[in-house]
């Protein structure tokens, strides 16, 4: 029994469902909220699209709640916004609040709900289109003709309080055209359009938009007919010409400023100044300084050469006593029938350079041409009258005119040049002491004694201290005795003059034995040959004062100082005298004669020390 009741119930339900499906009755479809709009931020309206009704009458309702609330509210006004809409008045609208809303559809078969929508009134503002749009063509006398457009803002928006800010946009087109010409007007409610085609009919519309929101709908179109006599002056050409002219002017000004020329200089060029004769501007541009300087008369750069061959290597400084001796010698020879020839003084070295080729040639050639005539190494004396020849005093020349000897007494044979007031004092320069000594020792070949670098074993040179009267007789006997033993190759002896340091004592001869590698000289006293009898050491004639080589200065100048060990040197001299003369001794005596004769002339007194001028050695050895 129970089984029969259950099966009957199932059958009834299946029959009911079949009947409903055959009649088309279903639950409603899902609705959709598609738009919410606020015209003035005070009220807003939302619209939705309903779904299928299922063949049955369907009711729609909108429910919402504000963010942060749980209480649900239903739409306050379904009529103001039209069908399927909900309008929120001022009392239901709140700024800066978010609304969460949805739509519910219900019929006999069931119900359905839309998706939730979040709405902020600030961002859903869309004003109404502008009102009272007016269009007019104006042709002022002093201006170009134009199309004047004017409109009014929507009435629902309060612009006076500043609650709203609207932006406007205008569009127009000829009636038969397809595209619109859009112009942005900003916040103003008037606008002028200049580019129009005469004789055509235009459509004009306007719309507005708040600062935060959407553009409104376009206002209704307004038509305007442009007259046929409406002449539009096209200013595009004139604007292009003006812009091009401005660019050209800027280029010209830039070029003038870049080159540094002024407008005044271009209009009124300056008067050219006088040109320097011989000055060529092209030489300056090409950079040839040598030709430019020669054109201006300036000296060019000095030529490069070996300055070691041109410059004087050493200098000799004469003090005032030398000038006094020169004046004395010139007074002693007032009229000898001889005219001295002076060399041009060298302003750089202080005395005429001994390296002058002309001076050396004159020194070497003149003694060979006339052996009986004495020529000074620095001054060449020539007779004014060729028939009248100058001869030296008989006391000064001996040994048949081969070896002239000059003593300090009596008539002096001066070799000093006469002073010239308009020139510098003629001076001689030092030569390298090594070259001088090689010239002296090379041909002689005499045995030498080596000097060490420290100067400890410096050899001595002797000086015989005699009176002026005894010196004359002794020198005469020495010349006569020396003439008997020497051959034709005996070199000349230079005159024994008064030394610059004022010593009236004649000096004895010294002998050059050897030259060290450092340029040091080995000196020995010369053997007396005037008599074969040795003299006692106690006699006045044998009282000799020796000098030793103290050292060589930076300028290769020998420094001679008096030797306190006179006894040792005297013994050395006596042993030298006892040695028999030989060929080597004879050759050494030749070199000694040249060295001794020039030593008295070439010495200078400086601070109590005696100097030897090697320049004089060269002249005597030649």
Curated annotation (Swiss-Prot):
This is Prolactin receptor. The WSXWS motif appears to be necessary for proper protein folding and thereby efficient intracellular transport and cell-surface receptor binding. The box 1 motif is required for JAK interaction and/or activation. Its main location: membrane. CDD domains: FN3 (cd00063). Residues 466-486 have a biased composition (Basic and acidic residues). Disulfide bonds join 36-46, 75-86. Expressed in breast, placenta, kidney, liver and pancreas. The keyword Phosphoprotein does not apply. A motif (WSXWS motif) lies at residues 215-219. Residues 1-24 form the signal peptide. GO terms for cellular component: cell surface; endosome lumen; external side of plasma membrane; extracellular region; plasma membrane; receptor complex. GO terms for molecular function: cytokine binding; lipid binding; metal ion binding; peptide hormone binding; prolactin receptor activity; protein kinase binding. Keywords: Disease variant, Disulfide bond, Glycoprotein, Membrane, Metal-binding, Receptor, Repeat, Secreted, Signal, Transmembrane, Transmembrane helix, Zinc. A motif (Box 1 motif) lies at residues 267-275. Residues 259-622 are cytoplasmic. This is a receptor for the anterior pituitary hormone prolactin (PRL). Acts as a prosurvival factor for spermatozoa by inhibiting sperm capacitation through suppression of SRC kinase activation and stimulation of AKT. Isoform 4 is unable to transduce prolactin signaling. Isoform 6 is unable to transduce prolactin signaling. Residues 27-128, 129-229 form the Fibronectin type-III domain. Pfam families: EpoR_lig-bind. The lineage of its organism: Eukaryota, Metazoa, Chordata, Craniata, Vertebrata. Glycans are attached at residues 59, 104, 233. It is a single-pass type I membrane protein.
